[in-house]
Structure formats: C-alpha cells, structure tokens
Amino acid sequence: MRLFVSVDLPDGLADAVAAVQDRFADADGLRYTDPGQAHVTLQFLGDVPESRADDLGDALESAVRATDVAPFDASFEGLGVFPSLEYISVVWLGVGDGSEELAALHDAVERQFVAEEGFEPEDHDFTPHVTLARMEHAGGKQLVQNVVEREHPEVGTARVEAVRLTESTLTDDGPVYETVRTVRL
C-alpha cells in the first residue's frame, strides 16, 4: 500500500482551491489535483506492506503526542513552484499562519518514521503547501511563471485538528485516498 501522512483541508475550501487552479486554465501541460482531496503532505512514506499499517498508525500517534501542537488555524495563501521557476514540476498553494505548527508536526513525524520505522529522511527542506497541479511539459511554463510571480491569492483559513495516515491508490482517473488512521491534536 502507498502511504503518506497529511493534514486535510476541509471540503469548504475546495471551491476556493478550484478558483485558484482556474488562474492557470490557459497553461498547457498542467495536470490538476482534485480540489476535493486538497491536503498538506507532512511525510510521504511510499509503498509499504499492508501488514505494517497498524504499526505505522501507532508510530504516527507517538509522533503527534511528542509535540505540543494543539489544534490551530492555518491560512492558505500565495503561490509557488517546485523546484524553481526555471524548472517547474509542481505548482502549489502556500500556507501563511499555521506554517510553524505544520513544520513542527512534519519534524516530529519525520523523526519518528526515520529513527523508529526505518524510512529515509527527505532530501529537501519542508515547505508546507497544497499541490495544485503537476507540470507534465513546459508548454504553459511562461503563463505559470507570470501567475506565480504576480498573484497572491488568499484562499481562506481552516482549523487543523488532526493528522492522517492516508493510503493513496493510483488509478487512471487520479489518486483515490482512504484514511488509515486519524490522530487528533
């Protein structure tokens, strides 16, 4: 099973996320994420045996309990790309308020899963974000660059009360997500 740890955006922000995606409508080469599945990935675990799901849920519980992060509000605003404006592979919506709490959760999860569960540490700094689209070819690169450099959408604020261990099943119609474990803050 393919797993990741995330914080989900509420359904109430899906329309606002879709409206931000619409700003890139004329850009060729983008494959959009489903706004109804918007989330901030704290740690991508990859393919793991199904037999480990319960243990990984317990590890997530331990990681969250090791922090002093209580429920908090996160604002979703601004745009960015990975890895750079010159070589765009991902277009994302940023996090304003709440980014420190998300970083603390990420750090705790990464420590737990690397030290105790044998996963590899990520090879890049954590930037809390919601993936809006992936660039499959550079046809729309200039438009994406222009929008990212000139616009600063403010999507809204959401109360973050839980972290989820989520299974991602890849299909021809896009990924299907199923919650394996929810850990309340």
Which residues make up each language-model segment?
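Histidine-dependent nucleotide/RNA phosphoesterase domain, centered on the 2H-phosphoesterase fold
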Residues: M1-L185
